[in-house]
Amino acid sequence: MNDAIHVQGLNKTFSHKSALVDLALSIQPGEMVALIGASGSGKSTLLRHLAGLACCDRSNGGQVQVLGREVQSSGRLNSQVRRLRADIGYIFQQFNLVNRLSVLDNVLLGCLGRMPRWRGSLALFNREEKQRAMAALDRVGLADLATQRASTLSGGQQQRVAIARALTQRAEVILADEPIASLDPESARRVMEILADINRSDGKTVVVTLHQVDYAVRYCPRAVALKGGRIHFDGLAQDLSKQFLNDLYGADADASLMITERSRRVRQKPRLELAKV
């Protein structure tokens, strides 16, 4: 079986400062993986390289493959990277919605990677695409807000719209960059439950960067910890120890980063019953 994600010897430097150092990582199809680490550890930088939104160093830059296809190698993006991105759903921390558009129109933007540019530029979505977008909104519990402007939604609702957009895109790999960083606990729980359900029910590969270790343990079987652009842990999330986390986060290893005993004892199963799109 081919890896869903394969990274080999990835290096990235910003102004002579190493952000990623000879990084190697393989993720199997259908895995749900948490990337953890302090701010500046390289989590978001790695995610952007997986999606072809950033380019590695030209000298000894390394290689990134997604779904068996090369995204970039030695500082050069694949010339067909736009087509590759159709299979990679990217969920941003700040939602990346168009505030003036309706919720439904934002979700329909997920169709753009699989339709002719002329039709996309004219926003000519067919009936099947609109039905798919509505089904995605129904799955995340927002179908009744389809005609509402995106700017009127709460942060948690906007993040669910972003997830619905990835579902409409029919992405095989979903990359979520700090999707719950700015959300209240209840909204964060719901977003993580939706992502976990997509992974479990649809078999999608999900990679999520998280600052909250307890969420990583609760929802992600596997955790990869980064520090200084290097991988310092790759294994079962439940095996993360408090001593390791203290070393990983240093002065930032406060109570909000520590694993709760409840999370350690049992990974909570998502409580939402979500229909497939």
From Swiss-Prot:
InterPro entries in alphabetical order: AAA+_ATPase, ABC_transporter-like_ATP-bd, ABC_transporter-like_CS, ABC_transpr_PhnC, MetN_ABC_transporter-like, P-loop_NTPase
Disulfide bonds: none
Catalytic activity: phosphonate(out) + ATP + H2O = phosphonate(in) + ADP + phosphate + H(+)
Gene3D superfamilies for this protein: P-loop containing nucleotide triphosphate hydrolases
GO CC, one annotated term: plasma membrane
Single GO MF annotation: ABC-type phosphonate transporter activity
Pfam families in the record: ABC_tran
Membrane topology field: Peripheral membrane protein
Residues binding ATP: G37, A38, S39, G40, S41, G42, K43, S44
Span of domain ABC transporter: 5-253
SMART domains: AAA
Compartment list: Cell inner membrane
This enzyme's EC code(s): 7.3.2.2
Keyword vocabulary terms for this entry: ATP-binding, Cell inner membrane, Cell membrane, Membrane, Nucleotide-binding, Phosphonate transport, Translocase, Transport
The UniProt record lists the keyword ATP-binding: yes
Coiled-coil residue spans: none
Top-level taxon of the source organism: Bacteria
Stored CDD domains: ABC_PhnC_transporter (cd03256)
Matches recorded under NCBIfam families: ABC_phnC
PANTHER family named among the record's database cross-references: AMINO ACID IMPORT ATP-BINDING PROTEIN, PHOSPHONATES IMPORT ATP-BINDING PROTEIN PHNC
Family: Belongs to the ABC transporter superfamily. Phosphonates importer (TC 3.A.1.9.1) family.
Description of how the protein assembles with itself and partners: The complex is composed of two ATP-binding proteins (PhnC), two transmembrane proteins (PhnE) and a solute-binding protein (PhnD).
Its biological purpose: Part of the ABC transporter complex PhnCDE involved in phosphonates import. Responsible for energy coupling to the transport system.
Protein name as catalogued: Phosphonates import ATP-binding protein PhnC 2
Organism per entry: Pseudomonas savastanoi pv. phaseolicola (strain 1448A / Race 6) (Pseudomonas syringae pv. phaseolicola (strain 1448A / Race 6))
Gene (UniProt): phnC2
